Design a protein with these regions (language model features):
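Intrinsically disordered, low-complexity, mixed-charge
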Residues: 1-178, 182
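Single conserved hydrophobic/aromatic residue that forms the stacking wall/gate
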Residues: 183-192
Length: 192
């Protein structure tokens, strides 16, 4: 499938991952210069429900995302995938939109104003529902190495959130916390 719209930097791949797992589909999903691509394997009746379930789940769980089109590119014999995974982004000539920055969501605001929370008073708190997108993007596909966050390694707690499908920071590229500034990766300064 080829999916276009506001589908990068909005928690779209994690949302698609959850839909695929809920429907017991296998395959993969990736960002690329045109939007998002996915290969799905599973029962034909379930595959027929995929687009409807994806649109519903995106509407309910990914408030910054917008699907413009879902196109079945081709059907092929099953490859025998045993899981559904988010794979590395693929390069190409850009034909997709960069999502605008979004105001802090309620869940992040609660963290910022809760004493004892590791993000208490941390102004750069964000998740897949809020935070910087356009202002940090250097190139697409939208992945951390293509953003101004590239020179900042995630701490182990941020990495755990990023890798956890149940977390709202699952694959949130600008994920950060106050520890971030302590583990800056040395990189030559680039003028903007």
């Amino acid at each position: 499938y080829r999916i276009t719209g506001l589908v990068q930097g909005v928690g779209f791949r994690p949302t698609l991952w959850r839909v695929a797992h809920a429907l017991k589909l296998t395959g993969e999903v990736w960002n690329d210069a045109e939007g998002v691509g996915t290969i799905l394997e599973g029962n034909v009746d379930v595959l027929d429900r995929f687009e409807e379930e994806l649109r519903k789940t995106v509407r309910d769980e990914a408030p910054l995302a917008r699907i413009d089109s879902v196109e079945l590119v081709q059907t092929t014999p099953a490859l025998g995938s045993t899981d559904f995974v988010i794979t590395a982004s693929r390069q190409g000539t850009a034909h997709t939109m960069v999502t605008p920055d979004a105001a802090t969501c309620r869940a992040c605001a609660i963290e910022m104003f809760t004493p004892g929370n590791r993000r208490w008073r941390y102004a750069f708190t964000n998740c897949t529902h809020c935070g910087p997108r356009f202002t940090i993007t250097r190139s697409i596909p939208y992945d951390r190495p293509m953003t101004s966050m590239a020179s900042f390694a995630m701490c182990s707690d941020c990495r755990h959130e990023y890798d956890d499908p149940a977390d709202r920071r699952f694959h949130a590229q600008p994920n950060a916390c106050p520890i971030l500034s302590l583990i800056h990766i040395s990189e030559p300064t680039r003028p903007y």
